[in-house]
Amino acid sequence: MSSVAVLTQESFAEHRSGLVPQQIKVATLNSEEESDPPTYKDAFPPLPEKAACLESAQEPAGAWGNKIRPIKASVITQVFHVPLEERKYKDMNQFGEGEQAKICLEIMQRTGAHLELSLAKDQGLSIMVSGKLDAVMKARKDIVARLQTQASATVAIPKEHHRFVIGKNGEKLQDLELKTATKIQIPRPDDPSNQIKITGTKEGIEKARHEVLLISAEQDERAVERLEVEKAFHPFIAGPYNRLVGEIMQETGTRINIPPPSVNRTEIVFTGEKEQLAQAVARIKKIYEEKKKKTTTIAVEVKKSQHKYVIGPKGNSLQEILERTGVSVEIPPSDSISETVILRGEPEKLGQALTEVYAKANSFTVSSVAAPSWLHRFIIGKKGQNLAKITQQMPKVHIEFTEGEDKITLEGPTEDVSVTQEHIEGMVKDLINRMDYVEINIDHKFHRHLIGKSGANINRIKDQYKVSVRIPPDSEKSNLIRIEGDPQGVQQAKRELLELASRMENERTKDLIIEQRFHRTIIGQKGERIREIRDKFPEVIINFPDPAQKSDIVQLRGPKNEVEKCTKYMQKMVADLVENSYSISVPIFKQFHKNIIGKGGANIKKIREESNTKIDLPAENSNSETIIITGKRANCEAARSRILSIQKDLANIAEVEVSIPAKLHNSLIGTKGRLIRSIMEECGGVHIHFPVEGSGSDTVVIRGPSSDVEKAKKQLLHLAEEKQTKSFTVDIRAKPEYHKFLIGKGGGKIRKVRDSTGARVIFPAAEDKDQDLITIIGKEDAVREAQKELEALIQNLDNVVEDSMLVDPKHHRHFVIRRGQVLREIAEEYGGVMVSFPRSGTQSDKVTLKGAKGCVEAAKKRIQEIIEDLEAQVTLECAIPQKFHRSVMGPKGSRIQQITRDFSVQIKFPDREENPVHSTEPAVQENGDEAGEGREAKDSDPGSPRRCDIIIISGRKEKCEAAKEALEALVPVTVEVEVPFDLHRYVIGQKGSGIRKMMDEFEVNIHVPAPELQSDIIAITGLAANLDRAKAGLLERVKELQAEQEDRALRSFKLSVTVDPKYHPKIIGRKGAVITQIRLEHDVNIQFPDKGDGNQPQDQITITGYEKNTEAARDAILRIVGELEQMVSEDVPLDHRVHARIIGARGKAIRKIMDEFKVDIRFPQSGAPDPNCVTVTGLPENVEEAIDHILNLEEEYLADVVDSEALQVYMKPPVHEEAKAPSRGFVVRDAPWAASSSEKAPDMSSSEEFPSFGAQVAPKTLPWGPKR
């Protein structure tokens, strides 16, 4: 074993040892020349005969071994081998096993088995699995499925045998899949196919196929016989390429199933008719007995690494030896360490077979060359060029580079390997002499910056110094960077990388908090101000957040010192902005605004410049008198003083300061400034200025004409005094349940307190935290009186009393129905008083009330009122057609609930009639029936209302009548509005949005007739109060639509203009810029002819829009055409090698030239007949200037191109490769098989010519006990 990795769940994450080294496979090429082929005797000299030691091949069982029964272990261990050619993950990345490692960890976690992996010399993978039997079997199945390449095969057995393969509840199939590590797919019962598909490894497929055929044979109605034949003699029975057993099956018609070499079974199963089966068994027995007598064995030692050459591709070499010599060659399993190969056959043929075995084993040799792993890439060369030269001369040599190992493995014919080894050793020596490497430590967090965007930095260093730089991936968190190449280049690259890293270590990132409102100002118009900052600090990167993020963080990144300087500079700029953002409002009488502005804005301009402020005046048509000044506080104050002084000079304006306590300012201003505005208007439009809230100042300034100022002052002081006296406050406390009682029904009680005392009583709102607090505000004496009254009421409420009253039992139900709704309302309204009615079933009329004395009395009074209402209750009928009932009720019955509350009545709607459609024809009378018999009198009267239309109202008579009127007012009415039919779809709007909006806005229903009726009448149904508004709204919408129709007709004017198609691209412009400008400027639609349409005139441009606009657009297009017709085109020869430089990155350079000279320059496309021809189009004088300019550029750039090409000749001389001749492979003369060379080539797809038989032999079983 070359390397072993133990995988456990604890250590697996740290396992990065390169368990499966990356193989660098090099395809061999045919040699150009070949010498005469050697003779067979020269290539394979005969070996001296030597007696075989048979004793070593057999191991005697201990005498005591059979007496002791083996103990069955609960934990078992199994070893599986995955050959190189069947490994799924051969090429692993340089940082570990990658996917294979993940898969193994997953298998261990899922199955609970323990895995150990090792790599054999032949690069095969050995996996040892330990654990309980079921865990090992599951792990094995997963390993095969996920780490080994999968093949598939089909086996045909009778359809009726499929169920026996599946077994009860699928158990047999599952067991078979676990045992063979395969996936077996059996067709469904309704599928006529009898093919069973097996997927897995080659060995697993053989085992599964054998087991399926055995199950089928057992169920076969024909005779089945099993014959025990030693495993070693199976190859003789099968014959070379299975021909012998195939002949027997064909001749006898018997199916013979020989276990594959990988299955450790000795019995051969025969299925067929009895007589024919007996013949087949007899023939097989005869062959077996004959071979058992005549054959003998010899054991030879052959290196394990050479076994695969003896086996050959798909066991082909073994079959060849068996065919030519009649000798069976038994190779130990690949997972065995044994190197012993057993030859079994007739004594006289063993010598020849032995010669062939050694010839095949020694036909190839394996050697290695010591070479540091970092030099491997240079030996291989760019795209394998260096190695290709070697493999062209030695095509049979396989060269293998293993990642992480300081050696190169060579495998192939001995002479070729020696020559190749010498060549590679010379290359290694030369590279060691002239190449160097260095490893440097740079913090991994800087690695991605060293690499640069898309590898720009690192690729530049590689190209500049001709070195290879290996940076570990981020996942490794490694700081080690390796530089390889020319010693001088390595040192230069090292110096530059360390300088970059040092610069990055010195770099820092700083977040600066700047209010987002200043970001646009700092950036400036078109980025001018930020460009100045970046020019001042070129090494600092400044990043502003996206405006959508609403972030205040501005990020600075760069060298520490520069970042600090830039931070201070920007902070100073922000401080200036903050200072300059102070704003004050100055009210100035409207008639003086023009004097403040001055002639041509002279006055205001002077104030702005001298005070360094921004002054905004209201628009002329605005009613506002306020002038806003923005800038530094001191400057704003100075500008305000100057503006006020202008106003003072112009008119008799007085200014008075009044001292009013700051706490009264808000109450004087009033809600949204209404109170102070009324004083200002009443006193001739004076200006009253209060100090900023929170400043603590008591000074209020009044400005205006002297007489008005005095009047305003008096009013303001009087109001302040009044507010002062009325702002006395007292807080009292009462339980929240008392509040409703204190307020009284409809606020009656609290209104009495307010009226008698003049004080305001404020109860807490639902969202207030302190629900006990009641606040009284007003004059002191009024507040004290109200406090006294309320405290007396609260004290009475705190005195709980119990009282009773008599209520007729017939009324009890009214109080307790709907879960005592009436009683709950009484309790809420009267301070939580408890009312207890006697139990149902008892005839008692005593009702008990418990609570505060006042509450109890009020509750008794309320109950008495309810009883009186019940006794005075009448029932009224209100006839409203049933179709209007839903509309009358309103959403969720809200309208009816409102009427019930307002009039204290009960309203009951009739049940809905199942079939509301009634025939207008008279009912047909049967013989013997009299008119009206069996019907109610009202039903027989056609004028009487239907039962389903009658709504019952219960309550006091006067309230019932009022409720009836209210109900009738809710009956919807319909009006018809005439709207032209062609406007209906616009009234409805997209997906009904228009009509839905009107219905919601006016609370009506609008019915538009169906399109097929072609009717102009739209019906509006709703409450009479809403109909007028809805009708007016609909007619207004019709007017709007008619105006839009007229506008559409005017906009649809079309105009055609004839323009030569060659000018169309110029009129359209780059990305449609020119034509878009014309469209937007003239508000028109411009349509160019479709190039693919042959029927359409190609010179007609159609313009659609208002007539005046289309004519203006036409004139604009014709002006462009006029300019284009004056233009000329000239071809100029320009060396194609400089085209790219003249065009520039993304065409920037050529666009600059075209804009500068106002010309169009067209370069030839790839594949053009003349690659140097460039066309310049424009006005004659512009074309000449542009041509002169680009010819000067050509001369300048061409000098650089010539120098560069001359340098390339020396740096990269041309490589001349000779023609490669096809390889003939390895050829010898006078070989034993030359006689059969005339036979046709073997068929690779034939299982007979390329079987898997004979590749391995079953391991010998040893008795339990100590090894001897």
From Swiss-Prot:
User: Where is it chiefly localized?
Assistant: cytoplasm
Q: Which GO terms describe its cellular component?
A: cytoplasm; high-density lipoprotein particle; nucleus
State the Gene Ontology BP annotations: cholesterol metabolic process; lipid transport
Source superkingdom: Eukaryota
Q: Which residues carry this modification: Phosphoserine?
A: 11, 31, 35, 317, 645, 1247, 1252
- The N-acetylserine modification is found at 2
Q: Which Pfam families match?
A: KH_1, KH_Vigilin
Residue ranges annotated for the KH domain, each copy included: 158-229, 230-302, 303-371, 372-442, 443-514, 515-588, 589-660, 661-734, 735-807, 808-880, 881-979, 980-1059, 1060-1134, 1135-1209
InterPro entries hit by this protein: KH_dom (IPR004087), KH_dom_type_1 (IPR004088), KH_dom_type_1_sf (IPR036612)
Task: List GO molecular-function terms, semicolon-separated.
Answer: mRNA binding
Q: Where is this region: Disordered?
A: 910-947, 1237-1268
Basic and acidic residues: which segments have biased composition? 932-947
Q: Indicate where the modification Phosphothreonine is found in the sequence.
A: 8, 295-296
Instruction: Write out the entry's keywords from A to Z.
Output: Acetylation, Cholesterol metabolism, Cytoplasm, HDL, Lipid metabolism, Lipid transport, Nucleus, Phosphoprotein, Repeat, RNA-binding, Steroid metabolism, Sterol metabolism, Transport
UniProt modified residues of type Phosphotyrosine: 437
Where does the UniProt annotation locate this protein?
Cytoplasm; Nucleus
In this chain, where does the modification N6-acetyllysine occur?
991
Bias-annotated ranges (Polar residues): 1237-1249
> What function is annotated for this protein?
Appears to play a role in cell sterol metabolism. It may function to protect cells from over-accumulation of cholesterol.
Tell me what this protein is called. Answer: Vigilin
Q: By which gene is this protein encoded?
A: HDLBP
